[in-house]
């Protein structure tokens, strides 16, 4: 199996021009498809996945892959659908596990392997439509830990943790998203300080780990939602699709000079390192 592509290289990844406002719907319409991948681990509740994908899929370019994992106790694909629908509207094909125990990374890896196989299957709607060396993992809480474990898949080069850890090694571009009241991801703001590869940390003022509206207080449907899903989509768009506009949100002449760093929003922490 081919290894992950280096960051910011010229490739045939889909880069349909959009507004550049990554918290808002991108240039692609989005459809959903459910698949049952059966038994993946002993303590699982579900083998179901939902695929969020651009509709129609491009014929002349390849769509990057993202695998998502839910937080503890969250079943199905609807709780975090706004995150993954938005990413798909910006060109990603996101496969989201319905499972609530995703911390091992097994569901992330299974989802990635499924889409890679679909890319090789002449009978599949995804046949020759996917950038199988442009792959990312993501998740919330326990799912973020699973995304970190799932980043061990040989095709993965990008990782996003929401309310949980993200990668800091030299092989992956890692983004962690958290809130100032989130006691479950207190290490996130300092992640870029120990990163050997591209890394960025963003902490929303007043954001917590859980709330009554959705599982993550800082991804409720308010300004925090748009801010978080904006960086989520932009990170993948930057490192999986070579989008210079997206990359400029995270980089600058100094750590405090990045595009999003200059904005007057409710961010308590915005910090990057090694952004190419």
Regions found by a protein language model. Name each.
Residues 222-247, 263-276:
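Catalytic active-site module of serine/aspartate enzymes centered on a nucleophile-bearing elbow/loop
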Residues 56-62, 106-145:
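Gly/Ser-rich "nucleophile elbow"/oxyanion-hole loop immediately N-terminal to the catalytic nucleophile
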Residues 61-71:
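Short beta-strand element of the alpha/beta-hydrolase
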Residues 3-61:
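N-terminal cap/lid segment of alpha/beta-hydrolase-fold proteins
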Residues 77-96:
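Short amphipathic alpha-helix adjacent to the substrate-entry channel of hydrolases
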Residues 154-165, 172:
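A conserved short beta-strand
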Residues 170-234, 238-240:
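Active-site-adjacent alpha-helix of alpha/beta-hydrolase-fold enzymes
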């Amino acid at each position: 199996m081919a290894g992950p592509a280096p960051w910011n290289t010229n490739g045939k990844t889909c880069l349909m021009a959009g507004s550049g406002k990554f918290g808002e719907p991108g240039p692609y319409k989005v459809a959903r498809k459910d698949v049952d991948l059966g038994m993946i681990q002993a303590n699982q509740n579900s083998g179901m996945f939902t695929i969020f994908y651009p509709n129609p899929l491009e014929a002349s370019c390849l769509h990057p892959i993202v695998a998502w994992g839910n937080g503890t106790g969250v079943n199905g694909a609807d709780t975090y659908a706004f995150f993954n629908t938005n990413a798909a509207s910006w060109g990603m094909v996101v496969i989201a596990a319905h499972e609530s125990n995703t911390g091992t990374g097994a569901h992330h890896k299974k989802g990635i392997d499924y889409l890679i196989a679909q890319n090789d299957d002449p009978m599949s709607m995804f046949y020759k439509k996917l950038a199988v060396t442009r792959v990312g993992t993501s998740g919330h809480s326990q799912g973020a830990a699973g995304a970190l474990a799932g980043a061990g898949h040989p095709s993965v080069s990008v990782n996003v943790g929401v309310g949980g850890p993200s990668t800091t090694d030299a092989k992956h571009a890692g983004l962690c998203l958290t809130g100032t009241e989130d006691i479950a991801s207190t290490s996130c703001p300092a992640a870029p300080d120990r990163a050997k590869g591209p890394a960025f940390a963003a902490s929303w003022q007043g954001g917590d780990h859980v709330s009554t509206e959705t599982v993550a207080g800082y991804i409720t449907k308010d300004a925090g939602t748009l801010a978080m899903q904006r960086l989520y989509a932009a990170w993948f768009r930057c490192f999986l699709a070579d989008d210079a506009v997206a990359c400029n949100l995270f980089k600058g002449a100094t750590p405090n000079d990045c595009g999003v760093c200059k904005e007057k929003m409710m961010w308590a922490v915005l910090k990057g390192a090694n952004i190419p």
